[in-house]
Structures are given as structure tokens and as C-alpha cells.
Swiss-Prot record:
Gene Ontology CC annotation, any one: vacuole
Species name: Hevea brasiliensis
Record lineage: Eukaryota, Viridiplantae, Streptophyta, Embryophyta, Tracheophyta
Signal peptide coordinates: 1-31
Record keywords, A-Z: Signal, Vacuole
Pro-piece positions: 225-238
Transmembrane domains' residue ranges: none
Name of this protein: Citrate-binding protein
Family matches, as Pfam families: Alginate_lyase2 (PF08787)
Primary role: May be a subunit of a vacuolar malate and citrate transporter.
Compartments it resides in: Vacuole
Primary localization class, coarse: other
Superkingdom in the source lineage: Eukaryota
UniProt-listed Gene3D superfamilies: 2.60.120.200
Amino acid sequence: MKMKRSPYCFCCSFALLLLVSFLKDRHFCSADPTDGFTEVPLTEDNFVIQKPYDKPLNDRYSYKNGIRRLWVYENDKPFKVGSPTRPRTEIRIKGHDYSSGVWQFEGQVHVPEGTSGVTVMQVFGAVNKATALQLRVYNGDLKSYKSNSVATDIYNKWLRVNVIHKVGKGEITVFINGQQKLVVNDDGPAEHYFKCGVYAAPDGSSNYMESRWKNIKLYKSDNKLEGCNNNHGTWLVQ
């Protein structure tokens, strides 16, 4: 006996076709912040170390087995004579400064217990201040500057950090271990670059500060991507 297809089935089929057509026109990511980006090759020449001016490099920095270890003391000198800035041992990514486009920093960071009151990652360049973003550690918690919480209980763990800067939109998004944790404005257009390591905060710094970094990478997107919505796994297109 020949069975008739119900109008309900036709409606379902039509709805499915519409859904497939809609999805084909969207960019997707697998909840990974690097999807849709192209890796920018880096060499050791791109890793410039800023350290207390009176200390030899190996007194504040080591690179062994793929791990970059950076440390500084609260009473160390600044990175150059006459600078009013706080003590630091930082990696400055050189050769890829930018003032437009969509750029991304990626790295894995380990902060030993006891390190506090220190910036471990920065997006340099802003209108009204020196930086568009600072990720600081206070008593085992990772914060944006001193307020917005990014991650808690981070001591003695490796964290994957991804920072996406959409210059045209003036927006910075921070991911920890692949999960979106923070979206902030970048305080206006400027010449930008990425930094990581240890840079003593204006106050509340521990006597000894250390961070370790590995798998540092830089990415750029040629598309006008506005970000990855991790709740749905899709790229939001400008």
C-alpha cells in the first residue's frame, strides 16, 4: 500500500534545507580561538628581552627545553637608565608591531606560587595610557589590571593564554584554556605589540616574581572576524 507523506514531513525537510543553507554561509570554529587565523612565523630575533639594565641576561632569563623562564626582584633596576618604570624581565615581540587588522597572541604560562602583584602579559599601545591590556597575577588569581577576574587559582599550573586584538573594533578578547574569559575595549588606536614575562605592578608586588612561558605563537587573520562565540562554536562575521 502506497503511503502518503504528511505535510509535517515536507515542513521538516524544508526547514532542514534552510538550516543547511544558513550554516554554509557562516564561518565555523571548533571552540578554538586560533580557528580562522594564520600563524605568523617567529624566530629568536623576534624575541627581545627587556631586563634590569645592570644585570647580565642569564641572571634574569633562561631558555631551556622549550621553556622561557623570566624572573625579577621588586628592588631591581628598571630596564634602562633613567626610566621611571617598575622592574621587569619581559619578552617583547619585535618585528610585528601593528595598528590595524586582527592579531592574536598565544602562549602557555606557568606562575610559581608566591609571585604576586605582577603583569605577566601585555598588549602595548593605547591613547590614554601605555597599554591596551595587562594580565596581572594577584595572590594566585589572574586579572585584567587590578579588577576584572580572568582566572583563579593559577599557581603552579600551565595555562594556555590566547589574546585576540580586533583593532578596527577596538576590542580585546582573552581566552584561558580555550574558553573566553574577558572582552574589553583597547583604549583607542595606537601602535601595538605583545609582551610577556614579569613586570612589577605599581604596588603590592612580591619580593620575587617569576613566570615561565612556552609555545609562544603569533597569528593574524585576513578576514574581518569579530570573534568566536564559544557558546555556539561559530565565528561572528563583521
